[in-house]
Curated annotation (Swiss-Prot):
Catalysis: reaction(s): 3-dehydro-L-gulonate + NAD(+) = 2,3-dioxo-L-gulonate + NADH + H(+); 3-dehydro-L-gulonate + NADP(+) = 2,3-dioxo-L-gulonate + NADPH + H(+)
HAMAP family referenced in this protein's UniProt entry, alphabetically: Diketo_gul_reduc (MF_00820)
GO MF annotations, alphabetized: 3-dehydro-L-gulonate 2-dehydrogenase activity; NAD+ binding
Function: Catalyzes the reduction of 2,3-diketo-L-gulonate in the presence of NADH, to form 3-keto-L-gulonate.
Protein name (database record): 2,3-diketo-L-gulonate reductase
Gene source species: Citrobacter koseri (strain ATCC BAA-895 / CDC 4225-83 / SGSC4696)
SUPFAM superfamilies referenced in this protein's UniProt entry, alphabetically: L-sulfolactate dehydrogenase-like
């Protein structure tokens, strides 16, 4: 089915207000969920909203909490999220990293006791729109087996890097081949994954999203490389925030909350003039996209360049929402 941005935001807002969330907070949160969905990231927008409400109802998310700064070391700050709403807190932390970068050239905010930030790419994009390089990542509950294991002991720990090119170039990737959100998107659409995304119950690689969702044997990106990168990202976020690691979140909490996150902004224009910056970025993009195609009918893509197109298409044609997901939201 198709809905407008306004219908989507109103539905989110209604559910939040019904749970006693302050009007200003509810409006800002609903706006972010709707913008994420409008950008084509359904897995962490509309599809994720019922799960967000479940955690709100369970008390994992504290909607009236206010993040507090704990430590300030010039370009580096440490904050405690107080388990406030994840996407609103993450937006505030990247804003703070940008403020620090405007003073120091680089700003780093380490956040502990945070909630799921929904679409991590929103915060990298936020920095790049203002002319900064944006880098951020989060740890999570253990939802992926380390390479060589059957048992979930590491997080998908998504990493975002956004570059202020024109258009913005951005990677937003979990350390698994597919996020659990994308497994859901493909399952709901009745599609196999385009490449292997995990293991079946017999230990064979599989493209069946429903099987992987059920047995939790999701495949690390790049096999042992994604497994290793997940571990070191967890270590850095834990140390800099003095927060909870994947092990602590998994073993000590009843669900995925109280995670640790990193937000970095770099002011490129302190290091290079604008014309030179743009020329260098354009040369990189042209060099990549003019490579000989493996399939003449399939263009070579640059990461993140599709989001502006998807947003514009959704604004023109309406936003596609799975019927079962919309029914869940209407019933909340």
């Amino acid at each position: 089915m198709k809905v407008t941005f306004e219908q989507l935001k109103e539905a989110f807002n209604r559910v939040l207000l019904a749970r006693g969330v302050a009007a200003e907070t509810a409006d800002a949160c609903a706006e972010m969920f709707a913008r994420t969905t409008e950008s084509g990231v359904y897995s962490h927008g509309v599809n994720r909203f019922p799960r967000f409400i479940q955690q709100l109802d369970n008390g994992d998310i504290i909607p009236d909490a206010r993040p507090q700064r704990i430590t300030s070391l010039g370009a580096i700050e440490q904050w405690d999220a107080q388990r406030a709403i994840g996407n609103l807190t993450a937006k505030k932390m990247m804003d703070r990293a940008i403020e620090l970068a405007s003073d120091h050239g680089i700003g780093l905010v380490a956040l502990r006791n945070a909630n799921h930030w929904m679409r991590g790419g929103s915060y990298g994009w936020q920095a790049a729109e203002k002319g900064y390089i944006g880098i951020c990542w989060t740890n999570s509950i253990a939802v992926m087996p380390p390479w060589g294991s059957k048992e979930c002991r590491i997080g998908t720990n998504p990493l975002i890097v956004a570059i202020p090119s024109s258009p913005i170039t951005m990677i937003d990737m979990s350390m698994s081949m597919f996020s659990y959100g994308m497994l859901e998107v493909n399952r709901l659409a009745g599609r196999e994954l385009p490449v292997d995304g995990g293991f079946d119950d017999e230990g064979n690689l599989t493209k069946e999203p429903g099987v992987i969702e059920k047995n939790r044997r999701i495949l690390p990106m790049g096999y042992w490389k994604g497994s290793g990168l997940s571990i070191v990202l967890d270590m850095i976020a834990t140390l800099l925030s003095d927060g909870a690691s994947v092990a602590e979140v998994t073993q000590e909490n009843s669900d995925e909350y109280g995670v640790s996150q990193i937000f970095i902004a770099i002011e490129v224009d302190k290091l290079i003039d604008g014309a030179t910056r743009d020329a260098k970025l354009q040369r990189i993009m042209d060099f990549v996209t003019t490579a000989e195609r493996a399939d003449e009918n399939v263009a070579i893509r640059l990461p993140g360049h599709e989001f502006t197109r998807l947003r514009d298409e959704n604004r023109r044609n309406g936003i596609t929402v799975d019927d079962s997901v919309w029914a869940k939201i209407q019933a909340l």
